[in-house]
């Protein structure tokens, strides 16, 4: 089995080198913002975080709340990198070893939190801070929350905790009171459509602005969903993204159907209207 897998990987690698093929990367990952100024639709939060860093006024426990796909984890990762970059002169250092991510949906027990607390005691070897990003924090058990309280209230000076959740109401009040809370908003249709236009231009795709607007509306404020829909429609329509292609792919009634229906009503053409 190992030999078969090794051979398959070798063949794929050789094909990529020979024919210039590259694995497809979804737009949500390919265009994930690397800097605060690249984050879409959360200017108030990104400006607040940048000012907090520059004025050395950053809380050690932050809670990022909001719907899915609006930039909570992205902002957490940017923040984690930026706070260690301050005053550091090595351009090639990414401080990856200073950032720990925990998915509370699958690591929600007391033992998981105690293991995290044991790590927190160890200071970073490079950079100023160790950053602990706990995603879906509302999934922690009651006992896990209680075990986490003391560390969250009095963290070591080298530790920053960033908690992210889509369901703030499920987090116990004692945790909320220990965190600086940032409420992420849904991305507006205009902001999402504008960002999709930039991506379309980057990929040399001729995109109808109405089509991009339809995708943004369908995403319902989630930029990640908008990018996922964009990838799907591009796979369907190729390098030309039209209103008709988006309507067909997303099972949306095209605006022409509405106009035609209104015309038939005004003309009192009941048979054609029923058809």
Where are these regions (language model features)?
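Extended, largely alpha-helical regulatory/partner-binding modules appended to the mid-to-C-terminal parts
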Residues: 70, 76-85, 112-115, 128, ...
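P-loop/Walker A NTP-binding region and its immediately flanking N-terminal helices
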Residues: 2-181, 191, 199
């Amino acid at each position: 089995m190992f030999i078969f897998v090794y051979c398959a990987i070798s063949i794929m690698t050789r094909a990529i080198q020979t024919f210039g093929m590259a694995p497809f990367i979804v737009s949500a990952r390919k265009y994930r913002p690397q800097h605060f100024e690249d984050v879409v639709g959360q200017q108030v939060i990104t400006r607040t975080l940048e000012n907090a860093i520059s004025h050395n006024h950053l809380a050690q426990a932050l809670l990022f709340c909001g719907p899915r796909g609006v930039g909570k984890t992205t902002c957490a990762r940017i923040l984690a990198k930026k706070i260690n970059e301050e005053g550091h002169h090595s351009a090639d250092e990414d401080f990856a070893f200073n950032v720990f991510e925990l998915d509370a949906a699958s690591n929600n027990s007391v033992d998981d939190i105690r293991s995290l607390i044991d790590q927190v005691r160890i200071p970073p070897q490079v950079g100023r801070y160790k950053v602990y990003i706990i995603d879906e924090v509302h999934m922690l058990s009651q006992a896990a929350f209680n075990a986490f309280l003391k560390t969250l209230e009095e963290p070591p000076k080298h530790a920053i905790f960033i908690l992210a959740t889509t369901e703030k109401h499920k987090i116990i009040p004692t945790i909320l009171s220990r965190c600086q809370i940032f409420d992420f908003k849904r991305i507006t249709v205009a902001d999402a459509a504008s960002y999709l236009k930039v991506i379309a231009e980057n990929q040399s795709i001729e995109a109808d602005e109405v089509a991009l607007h339809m995708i943004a509306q369908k995403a319902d404020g989630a930029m990640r969903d908008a990018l996922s829909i964009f990838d799907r429609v591009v796979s369907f329509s190729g390098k030309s993204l039209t209103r008709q292609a988006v309507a067909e792919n997303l099972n949306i009634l095209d605006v022409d159907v509405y106009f035609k229906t209104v015309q038939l009503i005004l003309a009192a053409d009941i048979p054609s209207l029923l058809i």
